[in-house]
Amino acid sequence: VNFGFEQNLFLDTPSTLLMILAYTFQIYFDFSGYSDMAIGLGKMFNIELPVNFNSPYKACSVKELWQRWHMTLSRFFIQYVYIPMGGSRKGKARTIFNTFMVFFLSGLWHGANWTYIAWGSMQGLLVIWDNLGIVSVKGSNEKMPAKWYIPRWLGWIFTFGFFNLSLIFFGSSSMTAAIQLFKNIFAFKNTGYLFKLAANLDIPEFYLIKQVLTLKFPDMLQYAYVVLFLLLLIISAVVISRKNTLQMVAENPFRKKLCAWVVFIFVWSVISFSQVSTFIYFNF
């Protein structure tokens, strides 16, 4: 992902799309994982910390996504920005303005960069659109009836696709870099740069396979990296489609099989340490 954002001038359409998809998974697993760790550590000291994520990538509208993503920050902005500005008590126009300001300030909160402002503004505009009730997802819990309804699967595709594209602004260092990535997507070109992008996946578990391929089948190594990249994306997609950790623990607080898997993954993770991995949200 880091390599992709740095080399934005050279990416083609497939490599840009897959890089952004990888970033979408990375930022969620990074932040949600640390939030779960904090909740677990809190329980060790008999401190109940609030849930911060509730499977946001299962949302079928942008409004629903923000009811599931970084819920503590959302509550903060609602309590200290949205409600003091009048909330939804002063007419539709004021409600729209207040909603937009919440997301505008949320973008600014992440950093004084036009990319964050663009990202926050995009979220605000789509949440406002959802609030207008023109189009809604079938089976949603909206109080006001909508003019048109779409299937949940279509709502999910739009929501997940929109959030993917919006993260181009969030992850880019400048507006110029973000615009370049959009140009790459809509250029509809395939220059084979995906092979170079995937070659940056240098994980310890792949070391033995890499050595064998280098010695015996050097021409196959670049394809192996692409397969590994796609496999990681598929695994990530499967994980977010299943029950989250809090749901699993709530259904069955203690299972020997689950505990054994947790211990195994923890030990494996420690053994696989090869470099310092920074917490993305630590910067905000």
Q: Over which residues does each language-model region extend?
A:
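Membrane-embedded transmembrane alpha-helical bundles that form the catalytic cores
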Residues: 1-233, 242, 248-283
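Aromatic-enriched
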Residues: 235-237
